[in-house]
Amino acid sequence: MSLSSLLKVVTASLWLGPGIAQKITQTQPGMFVQEKEAVTLDCTYDTSDPSYGLFWYKQPSSGEMIFLIYQGSYDQQNATEGRYSLNFQKARKSANLVISASQLGDSAMYFCAMRE
């Protein structure tokens, strides 16, 4: 396994908007992943609002924030956008990001965010 085929993934969280009572938690401080492997990044949340949206962003070393995917609380199916998909489980209050066939360009800080 060469170093060039490893990805470094770091997770963080943020929230958007005034909100009623919300909390976002990402428990994985960082990980190394073999290129072409699938990666799952955990995000759990707590909110008292029945209507909300969950977002995932990535921030590569260049610094810009890049929007990846959105899931609305009333959406019937898990969101999918290219190699990115969400494993959204409303009852468990989780919205885990799945990156299929990881690439070196996926090395970044990842942010889970919520808007009520």
Swiss-Prot record:
Pfam families: V-set
Record InterPro entries: Ig-like_dom, Ig-like_dom_sf, Ig-like_fold, Ig_V-set, TCR_variable_region
This protein's record includes keyword Ligase: no
Entry-linked SUPFAM superfamilies: Immunoglobulin
Subunit details: Alpha-beta TR is a heterodimer composed of an alpha and beta chain; disulfide-linked. The alpha-beta TR is associated with the transmembrane signaling CD3 coreceptor proteins to form the TR-CD3 (TcR or TCR). The assembly of alpha-beta TR heterodimers with CD3 occurs in the endoplasmic reticulum where a single alpha-beta TR heterodimer associates with one CD3D-CD3E heterodimer, one CD3G-CD3E heterodimer and one CD247 homodimer forming a stable octameric structure. CD3D-CD3E and CD3G-CD3E heterodimers preferentially associate with TR alpha and TR beta chains, respectively.
Subcellular location: Cell membrane
Entry protein name: T cell receptor alpha variable 14/delta variable 4
Record-annotated disulphide pairs: C43-C112
SMART domains on file: IGv (SM00406)
Record domain Ig-like: where: 22-116
Cellular component, GO, one term: T cell receptor complex
Keyword Magnesium annotated: no
Transmembrane segments: none
Signal sequence, start to end: 1-21
Function, as annotated: V region of the variable domain of T cell receptor (TR) alpha chain that participates in the antigen recognition. Alpha-beta T cell receptors are antigen specific receptors which are essential to the immune response and are present on the cell surface of T lymphocytes. Recognize peptide-major histocompatibility (MH) (pMH) complexes that are displayed by antigen presenting cells (APC), a prerequisite for efficient T cell adaptive immunity against pathogens.
